Amino acid sequence: MVDAESIKIVFSDVDGTFVDDEHHPIPESGAIIRAVADRVPICLVSARSPEGLYPIQQALGFNGPLACYSGAYVLDEEGNELLSSTIPLADALEIKAYLERELPHITVGTYGFHTWIVDSRSDPRIMREEYLVMATSKASRDLAGEFGERGVHKFLLMGEPKDILQAQQMVSERFPHLTAVRSSDILCEVMAGDVSKSRAVQLLCEHYGVTPEQAVAFGDGQNDIDMLSAVEQSYAMANAEPEVKLAAAHEVPWTNAECGVARMLEQLLLG
């Protein structure tokens, strides 16, 4: 068992890890999460926007830093920006035009800072995403007007599994300087090439004056592997993909729906 005194910071993926199968926070885990957050920072590391993470913190009653858009936008516990890595506007406009032309059957959401725009809020895929992340999009095609020269943090591609696999391959080939990763079989995230969860972990460790050896991290998907590899004590959820379990140092005995992160943290830090 890991020594509780050696753990100084916690990193956790969100969907498939920190929330239930409906992608919503589990109230029963709140008391444990609050007790842990009183001792060490709990950092949510997710492909979600800040607005997709705030409701989780609010529902469980804790505060902490956020690594949004898979590490492209990192905020401290007071909401101050620690890192912003964007796709320049000119590139973003080219990417959006390419997606509309070559992949018209894919639904695209565009995210930057605290803004999420879509072509149509009545698109069933957008409606589903709004429900899952408890955030609201804005109908707009005006990337330049919405984001300006600050650029965008990510494009979210939504579609059927075979189409998303094809989209990831096509975007990676057409824009090799970008990062295109599937966060599920129906979602692909497209971000600047230097974006990674592990980079956010390193930055937040430095910000809090701790080392990766003093960190614990939880994840379930392939896009969590680099984060799990960046810390000493890494945990794959019971529901994690096989490759993730191989990459992690430990396995949580419980799934996300069984409050696995909270129960593991209770053993590690409150036991």
Model segments located where?
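Hydrophobic packing residues within well-ordered alpha-helices of enzyme cores
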Residues: 29, 53-57, 167, 171, ...
